[in-house]
Amino acid sequence: MAGIIKKQILKHLSRFTKNLSPDKINLSTLKGEGELKNLELDEEVLQNMLDLPTWLAINKVFCNKASIRIPWTKLKTHPICLSLDKVIMEMSTCEEPRSPNGPSPIATASGQSEYGFAEKVVEGISVSVNSIVIRIGAKAFNASFELSQLRIYSVNAHWEHGDLRFTRIQDPQRGEVLTFKEINWQMIRIEADATQSSHLEIMCAPVRLITNQSKIRVTLKRRLKDCNVIATKLVLILDDLLWVLTDSQLKAMVQYAKSLSEAIEKSTEQRKSMAPEPTQSSTVVASAQQVKTTQTSNAPDVNDAIVKLFNDFDVKETSHHLVISHLDLHICDDIHAKEKESNRRITGGAMQLSFTQLTIDYYPYHKAGDSCNHWMYFSDATKTKNGWANELLHEFECNVEMLKQAVKDHNVGSPPKSPTHASPQHTQTEKDYPLKGTCRTPSVLSQQSKAKLMSSSVVVRLADFNIYQVSTAEQCRSSPKSMICCNKKSLYLPQEMSAVYIEFTEYYYPDGKDFPIPSPNLYSQLNALQFTVDERSILWLNQFLLDLKQSLNQFMAVYKLNDNSKSDEHVDVRVDGLMLKFVIPSEVKSECHQDQPRAISIQSSEMIATNTRHCPNCRHSDLEALFQDFKDCDFFSKTYTSFPKSCDNFNLLHPIFQRHAHEQDTKMHEIYKGNITPQLNKNTLKTSAATDVWAVYFSQFWIDYEGMKSGKGRPISFVDSFPLSIWICQPTRYAESQKEPQTCNQVSLNTSQSESSDLAGRLKRKKLLKEYYSTESEPLTNGGQKPSSSDTFFRFSPSSSEADIHLLVHVHKHVSMQINHYQYLLLLFLHESLILLSENLRKDVEAVTGSPASQTSICIGILLRSAELALLLHPVDQANTLKSPVSESVSPVVPDYLPTENGDFLSSKRKQISRDINRIRSVTVNHMSDNRSMSVDLSHIPLKDPLLFKSASDTNLQKGISFMDYLSDKHLGKISEDESSGLVYKSGSGEIGSETSDKKDSFYTDSSSILNYREDSNILSFDSDGNQNILSSTLTSKGNETIESIFKAEDLLPEAASLSENLDISKEETPPVRTLKSQSSLSGKPKERCPPNLAPLCVSYKNMKRSSSQMSLDTISLDSMILEEQLLESDGSDSHMFLEKGNKKNSTTNYRGTAESVNAGANLQNYGETSPDAISTNSEGAQENHDDLMSVVVFKITGVNGEIDIRGEDTEICLQVNQVTPDQLGNISLRHYLCNRPVGSDQKAVIHSKSSPEISLRFESGPGAVIHSLLAEKNGFLQCHIENFSTEFLTSSLMNIQHFLEDETVATVMPMKIQVSNTKINLKDDSPRSSTVSLEPAPVTVHIDHLVVERSDDGSFHIRDSHMLNTGNDLKENVKSDSVLLTSGKYDLKKQRSVTQATQTSPGVPWPSQSANFPEFSFDFTREQLMEENESLKQELAKAKMALAEAHLEKDALLHHIKKMTVE
């Protein structure tokens, strides 16, 4: 009996083993136990059974002892146990892929029989191995894998041990069965070391990695008919891993992986070409269904349950997965590598990388375009990627259809080519390319169109991660800070959302057909990532990666490895970002001001970066509109070479942008133009990565300050949110790609210059493309006719006007910025830090590589319609409180369009306005003291659309202006301020909307006419004497709800033209309307931010004085959200007045001691009697407003055009500003300003902006700036032109701005040259006056025709006029030496009179007449001698100036140090 069984065992095991004889088998038949010793397994059979990749081969497998235990009576429920003691396997890598694997021996043994009892028993075998040692020999290294306590067993669908009958799910209707296996081990030890060779001197440290308990879960789907495996799902699960790698070990790992990459890539291509057809199982399912129909019809309920269970655990396609719950990776420097420490800036550094829930999925056989809902970790990111990829596939299919038609037309219209006339690469057999006759084309195309396009996808997910800053031994021991991390928890994002999601997809045909295939695509999603700039970490990482790259290059050179990376192949890329944050911190000081920020953060709500045109706001039409906006500005024209630009600037608007916007850079465009012969091969529709045009779009982009003590842990706004678009192209790389040898199927890449018709024809109408071009291009003859020599538009040759990278930056909406002194100091410090960091990075690159860093040129264009910069300054000292508030407030600025000789008219006008304001004030005070006071808050009044206004010639006033707008500063001038109220009137400095520099929107309105124009007004009216009339519209109350008093603009504003006589408003000038909203309605960011020193929500406390006829009302508290809702619900013609709680003064007097401060809308405070509770509340609010009081100066900027040219170390910044209008708000509560400031730009100002710029700036730095000054290379050289500029300033604002710009340290000297021409500035002295002085100083108007201010390297300022500037002889130096000097230490400003005396010349006298003043000069010398002498003198003068500048700097530093010591 034993002999018979031995023969059967030999019969089956002989297929797996070598030299197996009966004497090696010990068998106990009754016990069901057997033992085999010294088994040598067959390598090829194991390769087929394990289905190893073809780049790996098994050389030898040996097992010292194997035992088997068979439970004869329980074969259905219990597995056969196979135990192996020690298995040794020797393997090697193949440089060329070996022959593909054959059929599995298990399937062969079953004789293609159906899935029966024997197959179930064999499949349920349980295997245990004490030790497995796998040795792999490769070209560059040797590796070994040692596994201990390996177990292989069958489990149920929930991965639990149990009865064998539950380890499989069989569906007779499908004719398929699912089986579940699990493999686990206690430990795996991995070692790798370089190959020892005498002629190779590559020294690599050995790599040793150890993992703890891990497991693999396998799900197999077989066919019942023949037991063949249809699909497999394999999941490798690794628990917590902690690996420490030195830089030498990491280098070794990268080198080993690189040595295998070429073989793995070849093997992958072989696998794709022999991939199984995905529809094989469908036919089997149908046949199996017919066979099993009679068996399954009897038990429909049971079958439904089986089908449901099978569907729940079905494996629809083969996939492999890696799951790591937590991975800690520590990378550190080699402590023994002393020879490298001299070159390293940071030595002994270590960095920790922590990854949580890392998963990698691989789907090798996914049909292109099919659903991915069955994927293991299907999520919203996968759904978004699928939608984007399907759009790409649809576009590709349309191109293929057009290509087929082009091939057909080409073969019909041209005779067949003979092989002798074609290039060798084009000589193809009829099988490979059968398009030689017109009769065969349709059948071939129909056959190829039925080919099934497959895709291979790799998905990487990362739930959370932390990359910590580098730590060194010199640092104090503390927990490391994050450099890159995920903020999902702080932003309350779903836990199932991945921090990083990356999916890469490639396409192929299973049979390896030479047919067009789509470009691979890469989709990435970044959620709530925060990047923190850490100087030490960036420098250490830069050195680490440079050293790694250098060692890899040496390794590849030694082993003669080819760099087969497909960097030049186009890949469709899309990167989505959600709530990304970029933080730039500053050095933390132990003691700092409460308004001193610790960091600046750059954030965006949503971001898209892509090189495809299938994403929102990144399409061809978006680029076309943006390009047209840039093209409409003369500043960006190639022919614009006037200041601030020059003829050396790059051509920003490169033709690549224009061609891409009109879809003229595609392969199909070239095919229909006749420049490429149409062929149906794999690379016909593929393009180079050099032709990519990238688009980056931020839906909301903003900048905050962080770490301010006054902010109470919340970020403080710096730049309010705005949408941002960036478009990028690479002209230099594109031109280089065109120089490379073209494939022979391309006739030429030249394109006709007749753009007019091409620009109009859009490739979106792809079906009409052929008809369109058939009338434009010449007929093709044999596909070899080249276009004319004039068709050179498409080929770009690199020139000095092209940079490596061109960027178009477009800001779509109005930009608002606010900054105080300490925030300004932070920006200066961060600017210096970033410059130092870039310099250190450049030096490290040169030190590691031994060669200069690559000089990259970048051209950046910036287009901004309007902006607003608010300077938050210290409060201005107020005037004497005993004076009349109106006498100090009324200082109307003389309109520029009025002649200066009209003194009487202006004087009478001032008196009239003063009387008007006094009348309004007295009426308001009396009205408040009459127990009917109220507060009018115009910050929430919805105004009409300014575009709907009638011209001033019809009505003189727009109907949409509310009543209180006429009380604003635009009509009444500057009203004096009240410290107790925390409100301010705006100064009449004009608006952005002024059409020319000579006109301001300052209107002098007869207030009595405004208030008195309709005596029958049922809302509010005053008589001509200023007495109060009846307030007929009583204030109604609804419990504790909002109290509203509605002014109707139609009733308050006249339509009769007779009012125009009292208003003196120009027909062309209409005051712009400001729409004021609460801050909550402005913030488009999904985060909580607050203005400086404010609570998170802007709360307005509203109250009203009650009359006897009114009900008792409680104090009403309204937050900004309620205000916003009511504003949205109200009619646009109504003006809501929310009654605001007044600030109670301690004094009992009725007059106002100091002026009120009201922001852009009159808030009239009540000073009547209040309850004790209200008094305490008011006193707290008054204290809060007083602490929050700041002087605000707003610069409204219109039309900003900028260009930044970077050539290696040289940087040129050209900036042009059409119009700048300062708006001096005076002392104002910061809360009111930030909550009530306008959100958008003034459309009228944008439309009527100046054609000629008021301010032009040019800044140069780097070695190229030495032509201006020796110091300019380091500190830069600034040139500024101010032309046709007209404005007004208060002396208090100028002094405040000076304090704002003061630095804590001695500022570096920046050479500069400033030209001011045709400029007028009105100066108003608003400094505090003594009580004895009743008259205030008259405004001073300064006219500057032409003035030049220069600053040299020694810090001195030189002031001269245009005549001195235009001289070109050597006398210029003498006059320059005699000109007025403004030393940086003293800032001694001389008067204009002393300038004329110091120069001792008259500007009107020509230079030749001045030769008498210089008798020592003789003009007999030749011009060449004089120029040579002049140059030598200039050099000596420059040296002297440098020495003087150093002396000045040293002196200033000492004075600063002495001053600091004195203060301390």
UniProtKB/Swiss-Prot annotation:
One of its GO terms (biological process) is early endosome to Golgi transport. Residues 278-297, 1164-1182, 1394-1413 have a biased composition (Polar residues). Transmembrane segments: none annotated. It comes from the Eukaryota. GO terms for cellular component: cytosol; early endosome. Residues 267-297, 409-436, 1066-1089, 1164-1183, 1392-1413 are annotated as: Disordered. Its main location: cytoplasm. Residues 3-94 form the Chorein N-terminal domain. GO terms for molecular function: GARP complex binding; lipid transfer activity; protein homodimerization activity. Keywords: Coiled coil, Cytoplasm, Endosome, Phosphoprotein. Disulfide bonds: none annotated. It is found in: Cytoplasm, Cytosol; Early endosome. Residues 1418-1456 form a coiled coil. The keyword Nuclease does not apply. InterPro entries: BLTP3A/B (IPR026728). PANTHER family: BRIDGE-LIKE LIPID TRANSFER PROTEIN FAMILY MEMBER 3B, CHOREIN N-TERMINAL DOMAIN-CONTAINING PROTEIN. Tube-forming lipid transport protein which mediates the transfer of lipids between membranes at organelle contact sites. Required for retrograde traffic of vesicle clusters in the early endocytic pathway to the Golgi complex. Monomer. Homodimer (via N-terminus). Associates with the Golgi-associated retrograde protein (GARP) complex. Interacts with GARP complex component VPS52. Interacts (via C-terminal coiled-coil domain) with STX6. This is Bridge-like lipid transfer protein family member 3B. It comes from Homo sapiens (Human). The lineage of its organism: Eukaryota, Metazoa, Chordata, Craniata, Vertebrata.
